[in-house]
Regions:
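N-terminal leader segment of winged-helix/HTH proteins
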Residues: 1-33, 138
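C-terminal regulatory/oligomerization modules of transcriptional regulators
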Residues: 1-3, 124-147
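Short, locally clustered residues in the helix-turn-helix/winged-helix DNA-binding domain
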Residues: 16, 44-48, 108
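A structural signal for well-ordered alpha-helices, especially hydrophobic packing surfaces
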Residues: 19, 104, 140-144
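N-terminal helix-turn-helix DNA-binding core of bacterial DNA-binding proteins
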Residues: 25-66
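Charged, amphipathic alpha-helical coiled-coil/dimerization segments
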Residues: 72-131
């Protein structure tokens, strides 16, 4: 095994570990705010504007059925609203309400504060993160390119 291959394997293991811990941290932040990570994700994908459930599901990499369940919860708590879709009468657009936007803003503020503390504890600066991002994106591009 080459050194590069060994380092690649370690990187993959560390990325999985980082993603898992980050996900659990997000779940904790959401729970403390009386939300779920799933609701937070759907609110986040709607922050750019109204979307259909299938469109939101594609963006999140989830099934439309799972996103529909979360949207149902968000509709019940007035976090989102269904508005007519001029392009498809049977597939309404789901839009954030003012309450949904406020919830998303609170969650984002809590998350940003937690991430800032993490970066300070790790002693990591923006340039280190940019380099790591460039490396990961090059690997992703290579994996996505046939050959």
């Amino acid at each position: 095994m080459t050194d590069a291959l060994e380092q690649y394997r370690q990187l993959i293991a560390d990325v999985y570990d980082l993603a898992g811990i980050s996900r659990r941290t997000s779940e904790d932040i959401a729970r403390e705010a009386g939300q779920t990570a799933a609701r937070w994700h759907v609110l986040g994908v709607l922050s750019d504007g109204p979307r259909t459930v299938p469109n939101a599901a594609r963006r999140l990499g989830l099934t439309p059925q799972s996103v529909q369940r979360v949207v149902g919860d968000l509709l019940e708590t007035d976090q989102v609203e269904a508005v007519p879709n001029p392009d498809h009468a049977r597939s309404p657009l789901i839009a954030l309400t003012d309450e949904g936007r406020a919830t998303l803003d609170r969650l984002s503020a809590r998350s940003d504060a937690a991430r800032e503390r993490l970066l300070a504890r790790a002693g990591t600066d923006a340039e280190e993160l940019r380099q790591a991002t460039r490396t990961i994106r090059r690997l992703l591009d290579a994996l996505r390119t046939p050959g």
